[in-house]
Amino acid sequence: MSDRQQVTNAKGERIAIVAGLRTPFAKQATAFHGVSALDMGKMVVNELLARSELDPKLIEQLVYGQVVQMPAAPNIAREIVLGTGMNVSTDAYSVTRACATSFQSAVNVAESIMTGNIEIGIAGGADSSSVLPIGVSKKLAHALVDLNKARSFGQKLQIFRRLGIKDLLPVPPAVAEYSTGLSMGQTAEQMAKTYNISRADQDALAHRSHTLASETWASGHLRDEVMVAHVPPYKQFIDRDNNIRENSVLESYAKLRPAFDKQHGTVTAANSTPLTDGASAIILMSEGRAKALGYQPIGYIKSYAFSAIDVWQDMLMGPSYATPLALKRAGMELEDLTLIEMHEAFAAQTLANMQMFASKKFAEEKLGRNRAIGEIDMSKFNVLGGSLAYGHPFAATGTRLITQVCRELKRRGGGTGLTTACAAGGLGVAMIVEVE
């Protein structure tokens, strides 16, 4: 049996990435303060349809993701369909796979096209760190349920007497893993220590990311893939990412204190992604349908793979496990790629994965391979800057990476590109695209 992955429909047509778009990414409580993930999702899908001049009624499926979900609208995908002029009968459902969420939505739509169930679909994701589901304590939640059942005033009074002042305080969304209690930052610290990744190297990668992202915005390359977002009360707008350090100076990174291990740590706010608001989306079609409608796709999906590893150690090493699977399914080696886009959750996590890509020992012991995945050529790596600069709205990053690498390959005359990311829960994803 062949290891090659057939990312085609029954007619042998490839899965075309017709267009992609995102909002600017904004740091928490700045430009998108008070704007929900749902509103950002509707905003970007509406604009994507308008720019591509695609009739919303032609969309047969929309798969959309959100990591920090709002109880008021648990199926963000369905609400986007209802808010963007698509047929009410359009199939829509929501997914979540932590930081790999919009990779998952893209794969789900692609697989619907591969099976012949649809020919046109939209995938993407949105997250807001500014509009959050603030919860209540377990004791207060328990008491509120009991209050709903209580009949007399006396019964209600007895329930209230069980509560202390602390029980009445709001509870923000958890930032730690449910199964381990470890935060992403703590895991990044562990990886930095395990693989001897210095503070200087982390700061240098962050500086590189900000410098390249600033240069990319100055070049105008992102103008066609980032919309201008007008936000309520519509007296202001945001037209570019606001986390990027313009005129980044390497020496300034050393001034920040460690964020997670105050005494011996090396992970800081400057070499980590900030909490970010934003949304992104892509249009996928069968190759034949895209041609029939007169579109010139920005790329095609060549292969993809997901991975899962232990959550106690090296939880953010997902790219090192998913990438060799995607390469094998594409019939490629790392050196065959034109560009590599790796999600930079933390500089420490990114550098640890780069180190494992080049490690024969890791390949033999963890992957069952007799050779390393390969040494990453930095002239191919995150050439426009990465998440450390752009920011990371959890569910939006995947389709941001896909669009960005496809459009950059197009500017360079074509080729193949790897997009890969780690995700909470020990998850990983890799997708290879080809561009003509």
Swiss-Prot record:
Location, primary (coarse class): cytoplasm
Keyword Metal-binding: no
CC annotations in GO: cytosol
Keywords, sorted A to Z: Acyltransferase, Cytoplasm, Fatty acid metabolism, Lipid degradation, Lipid metabolism, Transferase
Metabolic or biological pathway, per its Swiss-Prot or TrEMBL entry: Lipid metabolism; fatty acid beta-oxidation
Active site (catalytic residues): C99, H392, C422
Keyword Acyltransferase on entry: yes
GO biological process: fatty acid beta-oxidation
Pfam families assigned: Thiolase_C, Thiolase_N
Catalysed reactions, as listed in the record: an acyl-CoA + acetyl-CoA = a 3-oxoacyl-CoA + CoA
Places the protein is found: Cytoplasm
Known EC number: 2.3.1.16
Signal peptide: none
Transmembrane segment boundaries: none
Enzyme class at the top of the EC tree: transferase
One function term, GO molecular function aspect: acetyl-CoA C-acyltransferase activity
Assembly information from the UniProt record: Heterotetramer of two alpha chains (FadJ) and two beta chains (FadI).
Stated role: Catalyzes the final step of fatty acid oxidation in which acetyl-CoA is released and the CoA ester of a fatty acid two carbons shorter is formed.
PANTHER family the record matches: ACETYL-COA ACYLTRANSFERASE FADA2 (3-KETOACYL-COA THIOLASE) (BETA-KETOTHIOLASE)-RELATED
Family: Belongs to the thiolase-like superfamily. Thiolase family.
Entry protein name: 3-ketoacyl-CoA thiolase
